[in-house]
Amino acid sequence: MGAWVLFLRSGVMQMRNMFWPLRRKSRRRMARIVVDGPITGATRQRVLKALREVKQREFPALLLRIDSPGGTVGDSQEIHAALLRLREHGCRVVASFGNISASGGVYIGVAAEKIVANPGTITGSIGVILRGNDLSKVFERIGIRFDTVKSGPFKDILSPDRPLSDAERALLQELIDSSYGQFVGVVAKGRNLELETVKRFADGRVFSGEQAQALGLVDELGDEDHARRLAAKLAELDEDDIRPVTLGKQRRKLSGLLPGSQLLHQLQQRLSLELMGSGQVLWLYRP
């Protein structure tokens, strides 16, 4: 029995020695994670897995590239919470806003220590939206009628076969207001701003990166390389030589090589979010 235990211990030590150089090497490197497109459950799973790898490999810095109009509330909150935990672990996190980082993209971004945006980045859209579809007249025209048996008056709220009642609208507004309060509070805390200051521009409007800097939502103006250099400086890494290691890459399908595949992918994302987000509270910029 004793010999067997010694054998197991020896095996464990060998495994540790195999992976130890990888961990040591990562301590002088920078991780990079991309949040691209609408924030959904799939986004959350991919990003959280990548963040766990950043922690396990002990990267001293993370460059978080965000190019997203936002998305579902819960998924945005879980990514934000994981970023804060990573910072508590000692990792320096810098967010780089790309073409757009709005609504849920902002929520994720304010978990970073510093935010860098292009002067023309579309950002902001701090607010909450909830949409349903009233198709009652359409159903009436084609002769479709619904019979509903429910346990309470609000169980079929946002049902497409009838308009909202005043009581339902008031109930949903309370839900929206609660989510809005959470959003504004997180932005105020993350950006070290007064709550009332944030509320003055958190009415759903969008603004450029240049405007966002004037409002205190963004620290510096610059491209992704500027953000990379800032992250390297914070982590005391070589700004000139450091090249980020991208984690959590999205798998590219063979169809992505076909002409027009990018446009098709974008349309698929929008349609998927419309279907998934119907009746859900969203932190999403809808142009």
What are the roles of these predicted feature ranges?
Residues 1-103, 108-118, 129-287:
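N-terminal organellar transit peptides
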